[in-house]
């Protein structure tokens, strides 16, 4: 970094901000590894509130809150990352769903997302490095002891096991940790033996 200054070792990171109409969007920063200094480099304004970001290789996957209730809002946006610049590569929606997290499988040919509000885990094929559409949906059917807040499933987090053989989803509404096996075409099958309730 710096044409006429001493070369610095920097890492790049991005932050999503709900904010107002003026400052809602994605901020890109440099982090000077040598001294910990953070330098704001760019801002990309967005109409919707970014909820979660997942950078995989040269692409970043963002989930947006559907604040309008319209079927075309919300969804997942895929950006190509070029240093601190982002270029929209693909965008998918699914009847206005708001997804709160995405993960990619080891081969990066399928993405998975969770919908807290509707209790769903969805499969998204990736072709020629771009997300295509929601191809499969697993509707979770959990519930637990709180008669108001736990009447239905609310998935809150997901990740792959370290060996990438199982997708783990935590369900706040069902007080459950659910393990899924990934099929050849991205389909998810619940592993009843490994999954467990917390209460």
Could you say what each language-model-derived stretch is?
Residues 46, 95, 151, 198-199:
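Conserved loop/turn at the beginning of each blade in beta-propeller domains
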Residues 19-22, 66-70, 117-120, 174-176:
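Short glycine/acidic-enriched loop and turn motifs that connect beta-strands
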Residues 3-31:
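An edge-strand/N-cap motif at the start of beta-rich repeat modules
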Residues 15, 62-63, 113, 169:
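Residue position within the beta-strands of beta-propeller blades
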Residues 29-36, 79-85, 123-133, 181-188:
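Short loop/turn segments immediately following beta-strands, especially the blade-tip
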Residues 10-11, 56-58, 107-109, 163-165:
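Short coil/turn segments that connect the beta-strands within blades of beta-propeller domains
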Residues 86-157:
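Asp-box/WD-like beta-propeller blade repeats and closely related beta-sheet repeat scaffolds
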Residues 52-54, 103, 159:
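Conserved beta-strand position repeated across blades of beta-propeller domains
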């Amino acid at each position: 970094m710096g044409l006429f200054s001493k070369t610095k070792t920097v890492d790049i990171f991005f932050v999503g901000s709900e904010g107002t109409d003026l400052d809602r969007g994605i901020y890109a920063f440099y982090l000077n590894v040598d001294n910990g200094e953070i330098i704001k480099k760019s801002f990309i304004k967005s109409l919707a509130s970014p909820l979660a970001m997942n950078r995989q290789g040269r692409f970043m996957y963002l989930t947006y809150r559907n604040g309008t209730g319209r079927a075309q809002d919300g969804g997942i946006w895929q950006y190509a990352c070029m240093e601190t610049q982002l270029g929209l590569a693909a965008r998918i929606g699914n009847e206005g769903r708001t997804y709160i997290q995405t993960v990619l499988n080891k081969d990066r040919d399928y993405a998975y997302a969770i919908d807290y509000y509707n209790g769903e885990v969805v499969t998204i094929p990736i072709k020629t490095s771009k997300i295509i559409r929601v191809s499969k949906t697993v509707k979770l059917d959990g519930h637990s002891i709180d008669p108001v807040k736990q009447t239905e499933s609310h998935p809150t987090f997901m990740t792959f096991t370290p060996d990438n053989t199982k997708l783990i989803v935590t369900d706040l509404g069902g007080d459950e940790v659910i393990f899924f096996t990934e099929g050849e075409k991205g389909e998810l099958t619940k592993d009843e033996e490994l999954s467990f309730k917390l209460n």
